[in-house]
Amino acid sequence: MEAHLIFGPTSTGKTSVAIALAKRTGFPVIVLDRIQCYSQLSVGGGRPSAAEFQGTRRIYLIEGSLDEGVISAERAHECLVAAVEAHKPEGGVILEGGSISLFKRMAQSSYWNCGFTWHVTRLHLGGEEIFLAAAKKRINQMMQPDEQGNSFLGELVSVWKTTALRATLEGICGYRYAIEFAGKQGLEMDALTSLNRRQLEQLVHGMAHEYLCYARQQEQELPLPSLAGGEGPPFQ
C-alpha cells in the first residue's frame, strides 16, 4: 500500500501540500490531528473549508463532540489504523498532520513497519519572520466568518458558554492565548467578538507568537523520519 506521510509544525503548509497530492493521486487525506476531530472548533482547529478541499477527500479520525473530551493519542491511533485499513482497497492514503502525541504513538507501533511503501515529506519551521507573517495571515483569515458563518472568536465565545468545556479550550493553542488576552484586557468573553482594530491587532500578534512557540515544540519533538523511505519503518 502506498502511504504518503506529510508532517511538520503548524502553519508550514501541510494541508495545501496534502490537497495538491490528493488531487494528483486520488488518494484520501487522513488527518493526524486530534483537535480537528471536533466541528465545534473547525476554524481554530485548522479545518480547511469545503472550497479548499477542491474535490478531494479529507477524513477525520472521529467526528466527535467536545462534551466527551478531546480524544486521547491512544484512541486516535486506533482510529487511524482503522481508517487506513478501511481504505487499503484504494491502494494508497495520504497521512497529514502534526500532532506530537499521535506521531509519538505511531513511532511506537509496529503496525507501520511493514505492508507500506512510504513517501515521507517532512516540512520544517523556517525563519521566524516568515513564520510570523504566515501565521498572522492565517489568524486574520480565521477572524473573518467562513462560508458557514463561523469564525475563531465566534467559536470561542460559543464553546465558552459551556463551563465544563472551558478547561479544554484553555489547553488548546490559540484559544488559550485569546482567553488570557480577554482576562488581561478585563473583557468579558462575549466582548471578544467586538474588539476594536488595535485590540484585534494585539490579539493576532500574540496568537502568532503562541503558534511560533508551539511550532518550535513540534520541530523538536516530532519523530525523525526514516532517511531511506520506501518499505520499512517510517521513523528512525
Curated annotation (Swiss-Prot):
It catalyses: dimethylallyl diphosphate + AMP = N(6)-(dimethylallyl)adenosine 5'-phosphate + diphosphate. Its EC number is 2.5.1.27. This is Adenylate dimethylallyltransferase. It is an enzyme of class 2 (transferase). It comes from the Bacteria. Transfers dimethylallyl groups to AMP as part of the biosynthesis of cytokinin phytohormones. Belongs to the isopentenyl transferase family. It comes from Allorhizobium ampelinum (strain ATCC BAA-846 / DSM 112012 / S4) (Agrobacterium vitis (strain S4)). The keyword tRNA processing does not apply. Pfam families: IPT. One of its GO terms (molecular function) is AMP dimethylallyltransferase activity. Keywords: Crown gall tumor, Cytokinin biosynthesis, Plasmid, Transferase. Gene3D superfamilies: Crystal structure of tRNA isopentenylpyrophosphate transferase (bh2366) domain, P-loop containing nucleotide triphosphate hydrolases. GO terms for biological process: cytokinin biosynthetic process. InterPro entries: P-loop_NTPase (IPR027417), Tzs (IPR002648). The keyword Transferase applies.
